[in-house]
Amino acid sequence: MKNSQCGRSMIEMLGVLAIIAVLSVGGIAGYSKAMEKWKINKAVEEYTMMITGLLEYTENLNKNYSEQNKYIANFISQAKLVPDTWKIINSLYIDDSFGNRLLPYIGKHSLTVDFYIMHDNNRQTSNFAYQLCMALALDVAYPVLINIDTGGLFINNDALPNNKSYTVYRSSCYESDGTKVKCISEINNADISKICKSCISRSRCNVGITWQ
């Protein structure tokens, strides 16, 4: 009888431990998901802060354009358009709070920020890259570019035919040479999701935002 009770107690204990293990895994997964969501929201907040600030400086930056001063990573840092957690890599690149790399530069009549979303072993997961690509298009680029006549959004898209590498959206719906492209006003969750899936298979995914 005692042996039977002992065996039953051991089985019950193992069952309890199994339940605890499952709950622990679920808790860790839930925490990871919540942390990833927090990072996305934080990145969107910081990107929006930077772009909103750059919009105020665009005209002056374009006036002072030259090949020698086309890259503006140092300017962005000195103008306090980004948090102190961002790091200047060199005159070309600046890294955000989560290790994603940005290349901001000006032209004679434009300002562009290229976002390189990283998800190698030292940075984020491929799902984070996908989610951040989505957020960049829907929560950062769209609210800004929908109100700008000359805005553009470029996203890596491995699924495109004819060796094209980017899906292009323009506020005007046309490139400067008259080529018809997607309209900023037509941006929607389903299309952006399909495009941003390219980020899952890449160690570095590129999203570009430009305006005049």
Describe the residue ranges of each PLM region:
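N-terminal single-pass transmembrane signal-anchor helix
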Residues: M1-M35, A43
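A general marker of short, structured functional hotspots
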Residues: G27, A43, G53, I89, ...
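Membrane-proximal N-terminal amphipathic helix
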Residues: A29-Y65
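Short, glycine/small-hydrophobic-rich surface segments
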Residues: L54-N90
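Intrinsically disordered, low-complexity regions enriched in Pro/Ser/Thr/Gly and acidic residues
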Residues: W86-Q212
